[in-house]
Structure formats: C-alpha cells, structure tokens
C-alpha cells in the first residue's frame, strides 16, 4: 500500500481513521473507521455522492458509529502503547480500491475508488449498504454526474469536480427561484450585450460604469430575459454562471492548485459548447489573481479561450479599475467589447424604484407611498453627490423601510412610557409598604389607585399593539404567499403545465388577492382610529434619512425650527450689534435656502464682509453657525493669511500627484466633504495670494470644486463668508451724523476692492457688505453683551453682576477706540472689571448668591457687594 499513489483526501481520511481508532481505544484500524471519517467531512466527495443518491447521511453515519462501538476497546496495562495495527479487511479494501482506479484509468486512488471498494465488502457494512439501497451501479451513476468524464491525474482531483457549483452560482436558476429582484429599464444596454454575445469571435462584453449604476443588474436582466425566452434563438436555453474569484483562490495552498481549479471551470464551460455564459463581476480581479513566482494569473489563462470564442464571458468593472488594470494589458483588453453603463436619470430611477417597491414591501412588511419613491430619487440626486443613482436612491428606500420595520417590532413610545411609570410606582409602593406613619399610608393608597389605573391602560394598549402587529404580519404573510404563487405560475407556464397554470391563475391567486385586499382595507379603516404603529413609508422618512446621512436639513420644518428661522434676524442682531444690513442679508439668504427656493446649483449665499477691525465681521459668521447648527464648531474657518504664497493653494484642495500629502486631501475640500452643510469663513482674504482666488471661482458660481484626487466636492449647501479690512480707513472717516456710511466713502471702498480683486471673482459674490464703525450707543449694547457673558460664567455660583449707567459711560469712554472697534473694550472690561471681581472672589468678600454692582467713584471703577 503506497500512500504516494493516493490522493490527498484519501491520505487525510486514512490518518483521520487512525486518530478515530486511538480515541476509541481500539488496537486496530478497520474499514468502519475509514467509512466514518469519509462521512464526517461535510463538503467531502463521499457526502456529495450519497446526497445525489438521496441517502440519509446522518442515519448512515449513526449506523457506522454503532458498528464502531461494537468493536472491542483495550485500556489499562494490557494496551500496547503507541502500537496500532491495520486489519486485513482494510488492506483488502485498499487493494480493491487500487483495482477500481485502474478500471477507470485513473493515476491515483481517490475517495470514489474507496467507496466503490466498500460496495464489495461483506458482513456488517454490506448489510448497512443494503439497508440504505447503496449498490455499485447506482454509486457509479452518481459518481458520473459529479465527476463527468474527468480522470484522476493529480493528488487533489476533488477540487475539479462540480467546479461550477463550487466556485460560483447560476444566475438563471436564481431568477427561476425568485432570488433576484426584477430589473427595470436598461433595455439598450441589455440589447448591446446580446448583440456582442451573438458574434462569432470576441463575443465577450464588458460592462463599464461608475459604482452603483447597475452593471450587475444588467446581467441579472439578461438572465431574466433568458428565463422568459425573450432573447434571440442563439441565446435560448443558455445559463449564466457568476464566477466567484475569491472562492477559486481561497484555500489553494500548493503551487498549481489555483490553476487546476480555474482550468476545471473553463473545461466545464468549454464542454457545454457555448451553453454556459461566464459572468465575472469585478473583472479587474482576474489580472494578477493566483499569480505567484513562476505561475500564470487568471487573465492569461482566459486569453486564448476568449480570442477563439470558446468562452462567452461577460465582465463588469468600474471605469477607474478598467483603466488601472485592464487597459494596461492590451492583449486582454482587445478581447473584450466595451458596453458603457451610464447613470440613469432621476425619471429612470423613479421607474426602477416603482418596479422594486413590491419586493421591499413584502420583505419589510410596510407600505411605501409613491411620494416616498419620488422623494428618494430627487433628494438623493440633489444632496448625496459622491454616490450614483439608482444605488443611493434604493439605499434610501431600504433604510426608510427598515426604520419603520424596527418601529413595528419595538414597543411603541406611549406604551414604553406607561410601562416605565408602572415600574417606578411599584418600586415606590414597595418602599412605602414598609412605612407605618399616617402620611405614608395615605400616599400608598393614592399610589395604588394610580397604579391600578395605569396597569389597566397598559394592558389595553398592549392588547391593541399586539392586534395591530398581528394585522401587519398577516398582510405581510399574504403578500409573501401571493409572490410565491406568482412565481409558481411563471414556472408552470414556462414548463407548459397548463392544468397547474389554470389552477393558479383562476383559482388560488384571485383568492389570495381578494383576502389581501380585505386585510388591507381593514387596516385602512383601523387607521382612522388612534394607531400605535405606523406602517407607511412617506417622503418625511426619506427626508429624515437624507438629513441623517448628510447633515443637511431637508425634512419638513417642524414648528420650533419654523419660529427659529423667522426669528433668525433677531437672534443674530442680539449678538452682532449695530450691523443691521449685514444681519438682514445673511438671514434672508438662509431663509431662501430652507424654504427651498434658492438656486440649487449655487451655494446658499456668498458674502464679502468689509469693514474696520473689531466691528463684528467674524462674530457674525460665528453667530450664524451657532444659530443654524447649535454649535460654533460647525463653522469651517480658514485663515487666509496662511495662504500668502502661490503654491499654498494646494493646501486648500490637496497636493498634486507625486507630492507629499497627496493622499490626505485638501483642508477645505475634506472639511466640506465631511460636513456638506456648514458655514465657511475665509478670514482676512486680502492677505492671501491673488492666485488662490482662482480656485474659489467654481465654488462661488457652480457650488463645486474638483479636488486633487479628481473628486467633485459639493458646496451647494454652504454659506461662504469672506472678511477683509480693505478700505477701512475710508469707512472710519466717512460717517454721516446718524452713523451711516457716506456714499463717496462707499465708492472709495468699492474702488479699492476692485483694484485688489479681479472682476470675475467679485462678480460671483452674492453681496458685498460694508460694516460701519460702531457708534457710542452701539458700544453700550456691546458692554451689556460682555457683562451678560460674564454673568453666564458666574451663573453656577448664583452671583449676579450689574454695571450702573455711570460705570457703562466710564467703560465706553475709557475702553473704546473707533479705529480698533470693540476688541479693546473687551480687553478693558477684562482688565478693570473681571480682575477686580477675581480679587474679591479669592479674598472671600464675594460669596455664592451675592449681588455685585460695579460703579464709578473718583474716576475709578469700584465693586460693591450686596
């Protein structure tokens, strides 16, 4: 018995049989041990052959195990350590297996030869095989269906048996089983694929398109047409086999094993004489797949068959990967014919979603409104810019359905609140039960009354919830049943089983449809009452998912947000004092955007704020971010003084290829990709190099920038604010009596601005807003604001701070300089008021819950504690 004449799997089985004998304390390895180890391997050849013969594997295994238990076991001092004998029966079996291999003209003894040898066994195994109707003839018959007319010429032949079933899936069979969603549209692409497949040579289409546009769906559409026989004569009765490259490569430990597996797949396809169409999704994976030193990759193995037309192959890959992998190998590229899969339009996407609607409704057990489908297509196209239709729209609908489904399966909020309240009262009841005083007993009686009422409410709500859930599940089950019957009808019509088709079409299907209609009508009538569960997916759910994905508020305005937006101007004016024009223009731009009437291809608003230092330019941007997003952190702030050199522009959009930092992306583009709805503040723009502004032209006009990686970054949902001190000298000198800016000063400032920036840049900005220098009255308002902020910092200690009118006048007089704006005032309050308060706090003069008044005495600020 030469182990080298056996295949790897046979050797492994003999080794396992030895281990099994040792574990049972047997002195010898017998045929039953070997048979048991062959049946133990779930994916093994023996199991596959017996399954083809409809043998109950578990029962057979149990029978063999009983035979093993009958064998004598030796333990203790009588057992010879480390010695194990092979019985004569096992040796005879392996000799017979060798003869079977010779009969089949095989070079190695494989598992199937051992099985054939088992059929000639006498004794217990023979009786067991008879009980399960296992004979040599039907074993040979099953073996031929698994192995075909292949010979065993290597030590691992099992890998090449049933190669197609093992390394991929049959799309046509999946369509027949109803596992593939319907494909809507894409007729021109499917027709082009059919035309290429009908050619004599180079009949290999490759579908190229962006990720998510439906390349795989086109092939699934072709499979559906083949099932419906809606294809030319040459493609009828064909099958599409989707190759799984990862399954081919996985577990190929030895050199040549991968090539052996692939060759087995190709041979089976070749033998089918064009009946099998090979589909390789992610076609670029064949370039370099299985390539090791001195070995061939999958691409090179496919080339000869592709060129001769022996292999009908459909590939699918993205544009980038086609360019990166396939185009670099011209010999491979010329064997494929390109079919470009374009992104469908919004209208086409709506049609696709309408076709998939029923599938989603059945799977999730919900109802999808048509408005939700339209909203998913329109909103995904408008707001999710880095992905492609129809994939992103389908994802939106799927997630919205899943949201409603989880709500149906979870306890309703109203019932949850009542249940928690009951639990809380029960804990209180247990605590009060231990108390003996009159007050506690009275409270206990009141509590018990409330508890019994709540329990009654909870039980009725729970019953209502269970009933609603039951109704929803009933509708879902009926829909699933109807779907199954329709699939059976298609199958019956395809097989010309007219009796079954008539029974389904005129009997079962109408009955289920009627029952479903009644159940849905009952559900619709119940909706008039106060329902705990909702099963509708409307456009609100879709808008909510879009907002969750992108951070852009597209959901309908709730009452609180409505009021907030209408009061936006007032909110901004409270923090930015004395700049009514600027506040009004900015809040109007935001209102237009939230009302949905802004130009969808431009940013929400783009502004240049001009004015002297310290008048509220940067403060307005911060306030806007705070008002819109409840956080100043949502503001993307870029100090343009860092962009004084010409080459610094690459920091905004990312370094070009070949430079350090290319992979990292740009400071501006990456920030906006992560937060598409934000306020962008470009501070001190006149400090930047003029070349930097060329990059901003597209951002201001079309609301987009292409970064160094070639990705388009969407700025359509941003507010762009640029601040500058240009012309501040003219603004300081040119004020009217009422504090407004003189017309000639305005002209001088605009002239200076035009001299510094190019016309094409200024022409793209929505508004150029001049901030006027602050007057004394406005400065008093700013003093109040600074004191209010100080008050906020002391609020947790309940200390109030108040400045008398005289103190305010004194602070304004001493701390305000028109040239420097409000900043020196803040520093003055910090130095003169906050420092004095800090001294008193540390000294202990000011304690918690104190009232502090700041006044002026002898031309100096003093602190009084009350």
From Swiss-Prot:
Annotated GO biological process: cellular response to heat; protein refolding
Start and end residues of each stretch annotated as Repeat 1: 6-71
Clp R domain: residues covered: 3-149
Region (Linker): 344-551
Coiled-coil region: 394-528
MF terms in GO: ATP binding; ATP hydrolysis activity
Binding-site residues for ATP 2, renumbered to this chain: 611-618
Region: C-terminal, residue numbers: 774-866
Region feature (NBD1): 162-343
Location in or out of the cell: Cytoplasm
Keywords for this protein: ATP-binding, Chaperone, Coiled coil, Cytoplasm, Nucleotide-binding, Repeat, Stress response
Binding site for ATP 1: 209-216
Any single GO CC term annotated in Swiss-Prot or TrEMBL for this entry: cytoplasm
PANTHER family for the chain: ATP-DEPENDENT CLP PROTEASE, HEAT SHOCK PROTEIN 104
NCBIfam families found in the cross-reference section: chaperone_ClpB
Family: Belongs to the ClpA/ClpB family.
Reported function: Part of a stress-induced multi-chaperone system, it is involved in the recovery of the cell from heat-induced damage, in cooperation with DnaK, DnaJ and GrpE. Acts before DnaK, in the processing of protein aggregates. Protein binding stimulates the ATPase activity; ATP hydrolysis unfolds the denatured protein aggregates, which probably helps expose new hydrophobic binding sites on the surface of ClpB-bound aggregates, contributing to the solubilization and refolding of denatured protein aggregates by DnaK.
Domain notes: The Clp repeat (R) domain probably functions as a substrate-discriminating domain, recruiting aggregated proteins to the ClpB hexamer and/or stabilizing bound proteins. The NBD2 domain is responsible for oligomerization, whereas the NBD1 domain stabilizes the hexamer probably in an ATP-dependent manner. The movement of the coiled-coil domain is essential for ClpB ability to rescue proteins from an aggregated state, probably by pulling apart large aggregated proteins, which are bound between the coiled-coils motifs of adjacent ClpB subunits in the functional hexamer.
Name of the protein in its database record: Chaperone protein ClpB
Species whose genome carries this gene: Bacillus anthracis
């Amino acid at each position: 018995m030469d182990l080298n004449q056996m295949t790897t799997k046979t050797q492994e089985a003999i080794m396992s049989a030895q281990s099994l004998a040792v574990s049972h304390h047997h002195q010898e390895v017998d045929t039953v041990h070997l048979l048991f180890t062959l049946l133990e391997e779930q994916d093994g050849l023996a199991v596959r052959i017996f399954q083809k013969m409809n043998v109950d594997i578990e029962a057979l295994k149990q029978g063999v195990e009983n035979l093993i238990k009958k064998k004598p076991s030796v333990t203790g001092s009588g057992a010879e350590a480390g010695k194990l004998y092979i019985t004569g029966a096992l040796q005879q079996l392996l000799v017979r297996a060798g003869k079977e291999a010779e009969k089949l003209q095989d070079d190695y003894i494989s598992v199937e030869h051992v099985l054939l040898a088992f059929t000639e066994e006498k004794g217990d195994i023979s009786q067991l095989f008879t009980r399960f109707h296992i004979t040599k003839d039907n074993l040979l018959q099953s073996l031929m269906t698994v192995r075909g007319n292949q010979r065993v010429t290597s030590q691992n032949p099992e890998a090449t048996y049933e190669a197609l079933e093992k390394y991929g899936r049959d799309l046509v069979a999946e369509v027949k089983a109803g596992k593939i969603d319907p494909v809507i549209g894409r007729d021109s692409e499917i027709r082009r694929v059919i035309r290429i497949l009908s050619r004599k040579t180079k009949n290999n289409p490759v579908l190229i398109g962006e990720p998510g546009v439906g390349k795989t769906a086109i092939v699934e559409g072709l499979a559906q047409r083949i099932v419906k026989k809606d294809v030319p004569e040459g493609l009828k009765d064909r099958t599409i086999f989707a190759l799984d490259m990862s399954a081919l490569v996985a577990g190929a430990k030895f050199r040549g094993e991968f090539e052996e597996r692939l060759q087995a797949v190709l041979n089976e396809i070749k033998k089918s004489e064009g009946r099998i169409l090979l589909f390789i999704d992610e076609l670029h994976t064949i370039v370099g797949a299985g390539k090791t030193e001195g070995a061939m990759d999958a691409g090179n193995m496919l080339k000869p068959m592709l060129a001769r037309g022996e292999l009908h192959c459909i590939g699918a890959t993205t544009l980038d990967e086609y360019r990166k992998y396939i185009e670099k190998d011209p010999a491979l590229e010329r064997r494929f014919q390109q079919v470009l899969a374009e992104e469908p339009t919004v209208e086409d996407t709506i049609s696709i979603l309408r076709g998939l609607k029923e599938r989603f409704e059945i799977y999730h057990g919900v109802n999808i409104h048509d408005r939700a489908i339209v909203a998913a297509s329109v909103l995904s196209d408008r707001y999710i810019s880095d992905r492609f239709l129809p994939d992103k729209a389908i994802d939106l609908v799927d997630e919205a359905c899943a949201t409603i489904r989880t709500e149906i399966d979870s306890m309703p909020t109203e019932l949850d609140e009542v249940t928690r309240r009951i639990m809380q009262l029960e804990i209180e009841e247990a605590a009060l039960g231990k108390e003996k005083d009159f007050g506690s007993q009275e409270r206990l009686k009141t509590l018990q009354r409330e508890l019994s009422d709540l329990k009654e409410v909870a039980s009725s709500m729970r019953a209502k919830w269970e009933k609603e859930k039951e109704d929803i599940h009933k509708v879902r089950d009926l829909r699933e049943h109807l779907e199954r019957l329709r699939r059976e009808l298609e199958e019956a019509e395809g097989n010309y089983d007219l009796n079954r088709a008539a029974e389904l079409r005129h009997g079962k299907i109408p009955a289920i449809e009627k029952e479903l209609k009644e159940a849905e009508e009952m559900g619709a009538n119940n909706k008039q009452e106060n329902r705990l569960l909702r099963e509708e997916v409307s456009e609100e759910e879709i808008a909510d998912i879009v907002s969750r994905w992108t951070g852009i508020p597209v959901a309908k305005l709730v009452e609180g947000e409505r009021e907030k937006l209408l009061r936006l101007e007032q909110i901004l004016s409270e923090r930015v004092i004395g700049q009514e024009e600027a506040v009004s223009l900015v809040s109007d731009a935001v209102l237009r955007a939230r009302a949905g009437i802004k130009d969808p291809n431009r940013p929400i608003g783009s502004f240049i704020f001009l004015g002297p230092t310290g008048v509220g330019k940067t403060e307005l941007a911060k306030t806007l971010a705070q008002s819109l997003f409840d956080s100043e952190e949502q503001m993307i702030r870029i100090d343009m003084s860092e962009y004084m050199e010409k080459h610094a522009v690459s920091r905004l959009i990312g370094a070009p290829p070949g430079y350090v930092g290319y992979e990292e992306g740009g400071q501006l583009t990456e920030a906006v990709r992560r937060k598409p709805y934000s306020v962008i503040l470009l501070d001190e723009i006149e400090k930047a190099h003029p070349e930097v502004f060329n990059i901003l032209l597209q951002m201001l006009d079309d609301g987009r920038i292409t970064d160094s990686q070639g990705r388009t970054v969407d700025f359509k949902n941003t507010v762009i604010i640029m601040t500058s001190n240009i012309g501040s000298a003219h603004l300081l000198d040119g004020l009217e009596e009422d504090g407004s800016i003189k017309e000639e000063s305005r002209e001088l400032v605009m002239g200076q601005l035009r001299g510094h920036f190019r016309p094409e840049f200024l022409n793209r900005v929505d508004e150029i807003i001049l901030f006027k220098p602050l007057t004394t009255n406005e400065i008093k308002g700013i003093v109040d604001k600074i004191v209010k902020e100080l008050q906020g910092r002391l609020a947790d200690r309940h200390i109030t701070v108040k400045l008398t009118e005289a103190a305010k006048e004194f602070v304004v007089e001493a701390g305000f300089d028109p040239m420097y704006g409000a900043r020196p005032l803040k520093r003055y309050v910090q130095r003169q008021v906050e420092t004095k308060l800090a001294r008193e706090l540390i000294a202990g003069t000011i304690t918690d819950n104190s009232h502090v008044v700041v006044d002026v005495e002898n031309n100096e600020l003093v602190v009084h504690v009350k």
